[in-house]
């Protein structure tokens, strides 16, 4: 696995239950500012059944970027951790954003 993925995944593993972070914040914390899209691509390529808490990563507007069934799946996982998610996949970053 390349160093970028190692660092990105290490940061994502640190996001605590009941909190979220953004693609851009993950990239910045991993030492790759400006690589938000690459974080999204890396998460999109995860194998089925990955233990990485990918669902805790959302976009900078506080919304789930996925569509359809994938949006529903991410929404369910976040709600199971006590995070309030609107019908359109919006999360209150002021309340749920991870501040390491």
Curated annotation (Swiss-Prot):
The keyword DNA-binding applies. InterPro entries: ATL_DNA_repair, MethylDNA_cys_MeTrfase_DNA-bd, MethylDNA_cys_MeTrfase_DNAb, WH-like_DNA-bd_sf. Coiled coil: none annotated. Changing residue 23 to A: Severely impairs ability to bind alkylated DNA. Keywords: DNA damage, DNA-binding. GO terms for molecular function: catalytic activity; DNA binding. This is DNA base-flipping protein. Transmembrane segments: none annotated. CDD domains: ATase. It comes from the Bacteria. Involved in DNA damage recognition. Binds DNA containing O(6)-methylguanine. Binds to the damaged base and flips the base out of the DNA duplex into an extrahelical conformation, which allows processing by repair proteins. Signal peptide: none annotated. SUPFAM superfamilies: Methylated DNA-protein cysteine methyltransferase, C-terminal domain. GO terms for biological process: DNA repair. Belongs to the MGMT family. ATL subfamily. Changing residue 23 to F: Slightly impairs ability to bind alkylated DNA. The record marks 37 as: Arg finger, required for nucleotide flipping. The record marks 23 as: Required for phosphate rotation/nucleotide flipping.
């Amino acid at each position: 696995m390349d160093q970028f993925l190692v660092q990105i995944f290490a940061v994502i593993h640190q996001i605590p239950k009941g909190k979220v972070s953004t693609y851009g914040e993950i990239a910045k914390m991993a030492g790759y500012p400006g690589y938000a899209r690459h974080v999204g691509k890396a998460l999109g390529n995860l194998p089925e059944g990955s233990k990485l808490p990918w669902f805790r990563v959302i976009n900078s507007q506080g919304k789930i970027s996925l569509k359809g069934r994938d949006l529903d799946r991410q929404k369910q996982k976040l709600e199971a951790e006590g995070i309030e998610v609107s019908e359109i996949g919006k999360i209150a970053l002021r309340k749920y954003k991870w501040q390491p």
